Structure formats: C-alpha cells, structure tokens
Amino acid sequence: MAKKNPRNTRGKIVSAAWQLFYEQGYEETTVEEIIETSQTSKGSFYHYFDGKDALLSTLSDLFDEKYEALQETMDPDMPAMNQLLYLNGELFRMIENKVSVELLARLLSTQLVTNGERHLLNQKRTYYRLLRKIITQGQERGEFSDQQSVSEMVRLYALSERALMYDWCLRGGEFSLRQYAAQVMPGFLSSFRAENRSENRIEKTD
C-alpha cells in the first residue's frame, strides 16, 4: 500500500483553505469546508493545524508551492534577470487571483508584530533557495555584478517584493500589483546588472 505523503496532505489543506478564503472570505469559511474541498479528513486537519487561524501563517507555503511549479517549467538558459522578473510576475498574478487584499494585509501586519517565527523571512523556504540559485548563476555567467554578495542581492530582491505588496495592501488593491511590478521591478533591480564589467571586457578585447 502506498504511504500517504504528509507534505501533499498538508499542501492540499493549505491550497484549499486559501482558495476558499479568496472565493467566500475568511470569516465565512469553515474548517469543515476546508476539509471537504481538500478531500482530507478532520484528523489530518487537526494533525497539522490547531484551527482556522493557524492557516493565516501558511501563505508563504502557498507562495513556495507556486515557486516549485514555476521552477519545473522555467527555462534555465533564460537570462537571470528575466528569470527573476518572470517569477515576480507569476507570483503577483497568483496573488491577484487567489489572495484577497485583506488577508495579505493581515499576514503582513502579523509578521511585523509576532514574537514567533517570521515565515516570510525563513531562509530555508523554496523562495530563498531559488533566488540564491538564480542570482549565483547570474554572477557566474557575468550577467550580474559581483560587487554585491549573493545574500545581499537576495535580500534586496525580497525587500522590493515585500515593499510592493505592502503598498498594494495600503492602497486597498486599487491597482494591478502585477502590472505595476512589471513597470518598477526592472528599475529596482538595475543595480544587479554587470553592464560596467561587460563594457570593460569589450574595451580590453579591442
């Protein structure tokens, strides 16, 4: 008999919960509906979560699930900057389509005041591992400057994304998060580029 994958079970619960939160609202969603939609059991739900409130801290899980799916389909030969902008665009598209402004604002505010784990900053997340991989690759290819460390560039990228999400929440979602990010993220990340190094190499070969 095949063993039940605990990660899949937990992931099903998380995905179903956020789908329902978006479609009918957090307050209107019940644990029973989450269990039914996720096709799991009451025992499984309470094995992973104390109650519905505990699911509010799982938004980073939903994000990481998206990153894992994108990683499978993204062309690794794509320029590193394009990979970063692609990830950003697809994540923000998902946020617009699956996460309410109110719940995102609630998550960001609780992360500011919590005395417990700040899930968004957990360096073991798929998010941070993928960013480190892409940025390291960008430096090795000469696409990104080596004047900043990989860790610093990862921090700046994550900071830019959080700033955009915070502003979107602050303004009540009055604009397209994805479209606005497409306009400003290239500017935010321009310091990553190794343009000066490329120019120097060209001059030396002439």
Please state what every model-predicted region is.
Residues 1-24, 28-40, 54:
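Basic, helix-initiating cap at the start of DNA-binding domains
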Residues 1-8, 196-206:
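N-terminal intrinsically disordered/low-complexity leader segments
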Residues 95-115, 166:
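Amphipathic alpha-helical segments used for helix-helix packing
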Residues 39-49:
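Short hydrophobic/aromatic patch on the recognition helix
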Residues 49, 56-63:
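Alpha-helical DNA-contacting segments of helix-turn-helix folds
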Residues 68, 115-141, 151-155, 159, ...:
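Amphipathic alpha-helical packing segments from all-alpha helical-bundle domains
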Residues 93-97, 133, 137, 154-175, ...:
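Amphipathic C-terminal alpha-helical segment
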